[in-house]
Amino acid sequence: MSKVKVAIIGSGNIGTDLMIKVLRNSDYLEMGAMVGIDPASDGLARAARLNVPITAEGVEGLIGLPNFDEIEIVFDATSAKAHVANNARLAPLGKRMIDLTPAAIGPYVVPAVNADEHLDAPNVNMVTCGGQATIPMVAAVSRVVPVAYAEIVASIASKSAGPGTRANIDEFTETTSEAIVAVGGARRGKAIIILNPAEPPLIMRDTVFCLVDAPDPAVHEEIRQSIEKMVGDVSAYVPGYRLKQEVQITEIPADQPVETLLVDGNRPTHQVSVFLEVEGAAHYLPAYAGNLDIMTSAGMQIAERIAQQKEATK
């Protein structure tokens, strides 16, 4: 089968890691272009060495490339603000957009949860690195018992966060919180991100708290099994994704004022706590940068599903 040509806009950490994944690992995708705005960026230099067509003139440079018409899918690894402009320029030209920023123009997609729901959408949003790591856990709980409130804390090495990630911190929390509800199935969601400055850099760690009304111990076992199955589903495309310790399900004390976190409904009886770590594949940055790995792996997973669907309908 012929591979689908893709372009990546954004030659920073995420874009460069994604390019290496496509070149090394993909049976369905082929690099058509690497696009940046800094001629001196390491990502563009690497792309040139790997014989990938490059431009340092942004989206207009991409449109001007001789092979532009051959490119079917465009990954955007810039910033939320830039993606709005890039999408406005490329969507009328028939390019499928996979948004790796928190812009969220298109529907949220987390491969382990809703990979096949939006394969025909012209633009899909990959939420955030923290969302890709934690929303599957919220969904794993909510498919067993309603989740009144879910809170996630994503801790990533400061060294792995480039200028685009830092510019998107506010959008990160807003987009992830919304996707916890829209994809994870919680009634209400909250997201917190920590850029950990520790040296040497620490591996990505994520904590997920879900408040549930589940007094039955048999349901607790169902929740644990659902979480373990979901971890397996995610690790199928992010091999470094794993539980850091056993799932904890604890009774909420009567004097704990959890009502302030709820939309409405019954008071939750238990808190489900999930502790994760994500080790990167070290395709670009070292293994501590699991936040890159989970984002780029998820994006590539969706692009490959789109390519497979296209092949199946020929």
From Swiss-Prot:
Pfam families: AcetDehyd-dimer, Semialdhyde_dh. This is Acetaldehyde dehydrogenase 2. SUPFAM superfamilies: Glyceraldehyde-3-phosphate dehydrogenase-like, C-terminal domain (SSF55347), NAD(P)-binding Rossmann-fold domains (SSF51735). HAMAP family: Ac_ald_DH_ac. It comes from the Bacteria. It comes from Rhodococcus erythropolis (strain PR4 / NBRC 100887). The active site is at 129 (acyl-thioester intermediate). InterPro entries: Acetaldehyde_dehydrogenase, Acetylaldehyde_DH_C, NAD(P)-bd_dom_sf, Semialdehyde_DH_NAD-bd.
